Design a protein with these regions (language model features):
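Conserved glycine-rich beta-strand-loop-beta hairpin in the small C-terminal domain of fold type I
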Residues: 101
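C-terminal nucleotide
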Residues: 1-93, 104-133
Length: 133
């Protein structure tokens, strides 16, 4: 795993308020998106149990897309996520309450994790950490 700090403090309270407003404005869209996030979570649990890192990475990527649809991502987080993908991450997504905070990326091996870490820093991450799982 590679974890990157965006340098932006997360804004959970604001993110929750934005999603609540979006749910009032576009209830069908928000319900579909929330259902898709729930399905990603179930499938991610299965991928973890089966040791399927490729599927887990794909689901992380989908999850980030859905979080972006809920408007809890930021251009800075999106840039860090994109840099991880381009550097070969199996998947990447924001983590935490949204509107700042950290990004988590999944690498298939240690060398790749270092390349992903460098790419994330070049994309604006203040600090990165790698962790074997």
């Amino acid at each position: 795993l590679v974890i990157a700090d965006s340098g932006q403090a997360g804004q959970t309270k604001r993110a929750v308020a934005q999603v609540a407003q979006l749910a009032q404005d576009r209830p069908d869209q928000v319900m579909k998106t929330m259902a898709a996030i729930g399905e990603c979570t179930i499938q991610a649990q299965q991928a973890i149990r089966q040791g399927d890192l490729v599927a887990l990475g794909r689901l992380m990527t989908y999850n980030h897309y859905y979080l972006n649809q809920l408007k809890v991502s930021t251009p800075e987080l999106d840039s860090i996520v994109k840099s991880a993908w381009l550097a070969g991450a199996l998947g990447a997504k924001l983590t935490g309450g949204g509107l700042g905070g950290c990004v988590i990326a999944l690498a298939s091996q240690a060398q790749q994790a270092e390349a992903i870490s460098q790419a994330m820093r070049q994309a604006g991450a203040g600090r990165t950490w790698t962790m074997a799982i």
